[in-house]
UniProtKB/Swiss-Prot annotation:
Places the protein is found: Mitochondrion
Cofactor dependence: [4Fe-4S] cluster
Protein EC: 4.2.1.36
Recorded metabolic or biological pathway in which this protein acts: Amino-acid biosynthesis; L-lysine biosynthesis via AAA pathway; L-alpha-aminoadipate from 2-oxoglutarate: step 3/5
Keyword Signal carried by entry: no
Superkingdom assignment: Eukaryota
Cysteine pairs bridged by disulfides in the record: none
Keywords: Amino-acid biosynthesis, Iron, Iron-sulfur, Lyase, Lysine biosynthesis, Metal-binding, Mitochondrion, Transit peptide
Organism the protein comes from: Debaryomyces hansenii (strain ATCC 36239 / CBS 767 / BCRC 21394 / JCM 1990 / NBRC 0083 / IGC 2968) (Yeast)
Protein's recorded name: Homoaconitase, mitochondrial
Length: 688
């Protein structure tokens, strides 16, 4: 049996908890995210509307993989598949380790290229550019479509109004084989941008500031929709930068609207691309202009954040954390010397970024002792930058060019940070050790600030190149409200009933076992020392389950128990054993305040079911506030009625403690669980 991952609408006692609604109890309009998912969901009843919290089977418009294409291909072939379901749906790009000329890497690249040619898949070789940039340039990611990729920065596509979201390799193999995978529609947060961005501030400053001022997981595992009158004045490149870093903000997507600015962008793309182009042409752009889609007036959002753009100024992330952001005004006064500067990545190495940096650096030289690295997002971007002279201006200043690709951003190739060094980068992540040594310090900033810092030899702004101080920064004007309504359910009330497949239980119940901690990571669930012991028996997996969290866990728990834990359960690595070890203990359900996204996908993919119920963990924390035990048998019993989308919790004497509606678990997801997980489901589809 397995665990499934459902969520509830609940009061938010901890910022960042999922607040989801069930379509079976709410009759309302849809937001833009839900409308796009509706378009790409398959197997729905004719009158079925999808909402946050629902599990759906999706058939995305396109699926991109990069250097991980060969592991995906290996998994695909391991499923017994021989031909991809739809070669027009799949895109392969080589972008991460393009500087690596080792025999092993070249062999992998050769295998990917050959596989793509054999299958008729669109393939872009090393040097053509970063996959996400190619997806946008070539129109695979397109406004109002659903595009996925086996990469965490798939959120980028939201900048052009495409619902982009990441998947794991098993999902990608499923799409290759069947055209489909599953998705749970996240809670949707509306981020309203008001006012106009002041001179000197950029799209990068918006997202860096957002990551810093809302840094308590407010949008963790949410889909974001950017709205407000401030959006219309943001260029598409600014939108792409913002959407790209919604990943670091913790979101699963970052969607901008289709508006006049975006339509004008595509009018220009039509002029630039060879015509007739299969995806970006006069007809597709005309259709986009005439058939804009917006959220319904009565759409529901889990959160509503408001930021006044006019109160922003240049901001910098770090060191070594995107949750720490400091104004350029404050940081420039600290005289932080730098060793390396980077204008690379899918975040900020488009043409406008390179031109902005060139405008700052032209006529100057990179400071002595500083190495400045530049790589275009794609070969097309580099050609355009060369054509306008911006590329040469940067090279003449002393920058070192790298091939179009990810490179230093992912910690690969030339120019990585060494022990004790300080770097400033226009990339998206500055986690400790990501861009080189764990003993280095990494900051993130806009292309303009990176270029100025490279010349100054310290973190500073363009104003300082003219001998002027960085202007003072105002306090950022912002607010956040949460939809804190709780669905209190009358157990006798009638409601729509969910069909249950043969082999799937109509209800799941057991005693709640409290593991009272937030951020229990995959190593806490399944110790890393066992991860690569492929021959470890199931009984041993059951024995070591949760031992790094609590060595007494195995003595205190039994088959059929239900783990309940705090927020962000299963954060950390992608190891699938974190899910399968729980199954090995014959536990049918895990409940938490929230889950790590990769863990939640691995749960379903391995036939493990989970529920998010923030209100329940909050109640248990109140009850056991004085306890020091890591694992507690609560004497509370949970029953999940799958047919009614409803959870009830009672004590040992039968007293009702909580009744809660949850998202709908349809027959599509039930089928995956009955088949033993996504791989079993794919094999069954291939047989049929």
């Amino acid at each position: 049996m397995a665990l499934l991952y459902l969520s509830t609408r609940s009061s938010l006692k901890k910022t960042g908890a999922r607040c989801l609604s069930s379509s079976s109890i709410l009759y309302r309009g849809q937001n833009l995210t839900e409308k796009i998912v509706q378009k790409y969901a398959v197997g729905l009843a004719d009158d079925k509307k999808v909402f946050s919290g629902d599990y759906v089977t999706i058939k995305p418009a396109h699926c991109m993989s990069h250097d991980n294409s060969w592991p995906v291909a290996t998994k695909f072939m391991g499923l017994g598949a021989t031909n991809v379901h739809d070669n027009r749906q799949i895109v392969c790009t080589l972008d991460h380790d393009v500087q690596n000329k080792s025999e092993k890497n070249l062999e992998k690249y050769h295998n990917i290229e050959n596989f793509a040619k054999e299958q008729g898949i669109d393939f872009y070789p090393a040097g053509r550019g970063i996959g996400h940039q190619i997806m946008i340039e070539e129109g695979y990611a397109y406004p109002l479509n659903l595009t996925v990729a086996s990469d965490s920065h798939s959120n980028t596509y939201g900048g052009i109004g495409s619902l982009g979201t990441p998947i794991v390799r098993t999902d990608a193999a499923s799409i290759w084989a069947t055209g489909q995978t599953w998705w749970q529609i996240p809670p949707v947060a509306k981020v309203e941008l008001v006012g106009q961005l002041p001179k000197g501030a950029t799209g990068k400053d918006i997202i860096v500031a957002l990551c810093g001022i809302f840094n308590n997981d407010e949008v963790l595992n949410h889909a974001i929709e950017f709205t407000g009158e401030g959006v219309k004045n943001l260029s598409v490149d600014y939108r792409l930068t913002i959407a790209n870093m919604t990943t670091e903000w913790g979101a699963l997507s970052g969607l901008f609207p289709v508006d006049e600015t975006l339509v004008n962008f595509y009018d220009e793309r039509v002029k630039k691309l060879p015509q007739p182009h299969p995806r970006v042409n006069e007809n597709t752009v005309k259709n986009l202009s005439e058939n804009k889609v917006n959220s319904d007036n009565d759409a529901v959002y889990a959160k509503h954040l408001v930021v006044d753009l006019s109160s922003l100024s240049p901001y910098i992330s770090g060191p070594n954390s995107v949750k720490v952001s400091t104004s350029l005004h404050d940081l420039s006064k600290q005289n932080i010397k730098i060793n390396k500067a980077y204008l690379v990545s899918c975040t900020n190495s488009r043409l406008s970024d390179i031109k902005a940096a060139a405008d700052i650096i032209k006529g100057h030289k990179v400071a002595e002792g500083v190495e400045f690295y530049v790589a275009a997002a794609s070969s097309n971007v580099q050609k355009d930058a060369e054509a306008i002279g911006a590329w040469q201006d940067i090279i003449d200043a002393g920058a070192k060019p790298l091939p179009a690709g990810c490179g230093p951003c992912i910690g690969l190739g030339t120019g990585l940070l060494e022990d004790g060094e300080v770097g400033i980068s226009a990339t998206n992540r500055n986690f400790k050790g990501r861009m080189g040594s764990k003993d280095a310090l990494a900051y993130l900033a806009s292309p303009e600030v990176v270029a100025a810092s490279a010349v100054l030899g310290k973190i500073g702004g363009p104003e300082e190149l003219q001998g002027n101080p960085v202007p003072t920064n105002p306090e950022i004007v912002r607010s956040i409200t949460s939809n804190e309504s709780t669905e209190t359910v009358d157990p006798d009330a009638s409601g729509s009933s969910v069909d249950v497949l043969d082999g799937f239980p109509q209800s799941i119940e057991g005693e709640l076992i409290l593991c009272d901690a937030d951020n229990i990571n995959t190593d806490g669930i399944y110790p890393g020392k066992y991860t690569y012991q492929d021959d470890i028996p199931r009984s041993k997996m059951a024995e070591v389950c949760m031992e790094n969290y609590d060595s007494e866990f195995k003595q205190k728990t039994k088959a059929g128990d239900i783990i309940i834990s705090g927020y962000n359960f299963g954060t950390g690595s992608s190891r699938e054993q974190a899910a399968t070890a729980i199954l090995a203990r014959d536990m049918k359900l895990v409940v938490a305040g929230s889950f790590g996204n990769i863990f939640s996908r691995n749960s379903i993919n391995n036939a493990l079911l989970t529920l998010e119920i923030p209100a329940l963990i909050n109640k248990l924390r109140e009850k056991y506030a004085q306890s020091n035990e890591l694992t507690i048998r609560t004497g509370w019993f949970l029953k999940w009625d799958v047919t009614k989308n409803q959870v009830t919790v009672s004590d040992s004497e039968g007293n009702l403690i909580l009744t809660q509606k949850v998202g709908e678990l349809g027959t599509n997801l039930q089928d995956i669980i009955v088949k033993g997980g996504l791989e079993g489901w794919v094999k069954a589809q291939l047989k049929n």
